[in-house]
Amino acid sequence: SGSCEMKTCWKSMPTFGDIGQVLKEKFDGATEVQSLKIGSRQQLVPTQRDFKPHTSSDLVYLVPSPDFCEEDLKVSIPVGLTFSHPPNQGSLGTHGRRCNKTSKAIDGCELMCCGRGFNTHIEEVIERCSCKF
């Protein structure tokens, strides 16, 4: 009948939100590992024996993150297979920091205060304002 069929294929990137969701899931399921010499090769092995071995697409880490809620000035940064303690690094914690009571973002009191609760402080400021009408 003279009709023809044409098929076109292309690849497209997932949305930024989809990529973020995959990364968040990988972060939440990350496995702490240690570098061990097995035979003549260095291998990354889970620190917890009951954890399954990781795959090449899993997220792994050698050093746990500091507790950002509490002060933790001791940070170990892997350098090769040894660890160094650089000065002026770590976490000062969140005690005493100002937060936004109504925010659900990282500046919000619920998140920043790490479940410890927070004090509300109301301050009234009276200023002279050279207003002209």
Curated annotation (Swiss-Prot):
A GO MF label: signaling receptor binding
Modification after translation: Palmitoleoylation is required for efficient binding to frizzled receptors. Depalmitoleoylation leads to Wnt signaling pathway inhibition.
Stored Pfam families: wnt (PF00110)
UniProt keyword annotations, A-Z: Developmental protein, Disulfide bond, Extracellular matrix, Glycoprotein, Lipoprotein, Secreted, Wnt signaling pathway
Subcellular location field: Secreted, Extracellular space, Extracellular matrix
Disulfide bonds: 69-114, 99-109
Taxonomy, superkingdom: Eukaryota
Coiled coil segments of this chain: none
Keyword Glycoprotein: yes
InterPro entries, A to Z: Wnt (IPR005817), Wnt_C (IPR043158)
Signal peptide: none
Glycan attachment points: 100
GO BP term, pick one: Wnt signaling pathway
Gene3D superfamilies for the chain: 3.30.2460.20
Gene Ontology CC terms: extracellular region
Lipid-attached positions, O-palmitoleoyl serine: 1
Segments traversing the membrane: none
PANTHER family listed in its UniProt record: PROTEIN WNT-4, WNT RELATED
Family (UniProt): Belongs to the Wnt family.
Function description: Ligand for members of the frizzled family of seven transmembrane receptors. Plays an important role in embryonic development.
UniProt protein name: Protein Wnt-4
Organism: Strongylocentrotus purpuratus
